[in-house]
Amino acid sequence: REFEQMKAVADEAGLETEFIENAAAQAKWPLMNFAAAKAVLWCPSDGYLQPSDLTMAYVAHARRRGAKFLTGTPVRSIHVEKGHVTGVETDTDTIACKTVVNATGAHAFHVARSVGLELPIVPVRHEFFVTVHADGLEPDLPVVRIPDATLYLRAETNALLCGGWEPKALSSDPRDYPLADEPPLIEPDYEVLGGFAEQLGPHLPKVNQLGLRSVFRGWPTFTPDGRFIIGPSSQLSGFVMAGGCNAHGVSGSAGIGRHVVESMSEDTPSDYVRSLSPDRFAANGWNWETARRDAQHYYETYYCLGH
């Protein structure tokens, strides 16, 4: 039933999907064991991208439209006069502007707070691993998600990339480190990573024979209601949020950009875009203890069927 609901959402979005037999799935991923699968939902257009390649594609297109980029130029402060954004201060200059978009990831909380906005943007730890190269792992193998095991996997060239959503998430409190500092260093948690491999074992027996090559980790930000924080703040004219992306910052970036533009340029944005406004937290009382717990819950149940 849950997969049928997923298919209905995909159909509504115009994505081609179909249920396929286990044998057909086995043919697409020969190293995997689909014998116990009760349903396999196939999306031919699914895939993945490299964040750096996507970023450079955005940059190239933006430059063609007249945008300018100042790389290696940190913004030190946002200038505000009489409730309006008037510019930003960099290491070398002051740039006058009427609009600032806060798209700073794990530091989105700090940038918002610097202009007087308190928003529940919670960094939550996420890890994945890449194995050594192995026979049978080819770059064109499909991306696989196993909701019951809260795992995702794909080929990384001729290696295996596997990550998952921890059942007991670890978050950081952004109030504990300043804007000028990096978020806390994450050491690889081999107990968690080993749990991913153990969960994957029945579906991909070969995983237990593959050596570990590298571990990747970071702090994607989550919100207490599991929705983006997008759009202008009524408390400060010209300050626009694009944060709290709930681990969709890269994959959802084009849609997030479209929502940001709609929130800024449309007289009457859609109900959905209005529902993402940062004002929803200003209007409703919240506290950090509850916000962290709720944000972690959305991380922990990221793949939960029936959630």
Question: Where does each model-flagged region fall?
Answer:
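Dinucleotide-binding Rossmann-like beta1-alpha1 core, especially the glycine-rich loop
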Residues: 1-28, 150-153
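A short, glycine/Asx- and small/polar-enriched loop/turn
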Residues: 2, 29-37, 79-86, 222-226, ...
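C-terminal lid/capping helical subdomain adjacent to the catalytic/cofactor pocket in oxidative enzymes
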Residues: 19, 24, 234-307
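Short loop/edge segments at beta-strand edges and connector loops
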Residues: 21, 71-73, 214
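Mid-domain beta-loop-alpha active-site segment that forms a flexible
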Residues: 40-61, 105-107, 188-199, 245, ...
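Helical element adjacent to the flavin cofactor pocket in flavoenzyme catalytic cores
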Residues: 41-99, 107
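Central helical "cap/lid" subdomain
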Residues: 93-142, 158
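Active-site lid/adjacent beta-loop-alpha segment flanking the redox-cofactor pocket in flavoenzymes
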Residues: 135-238
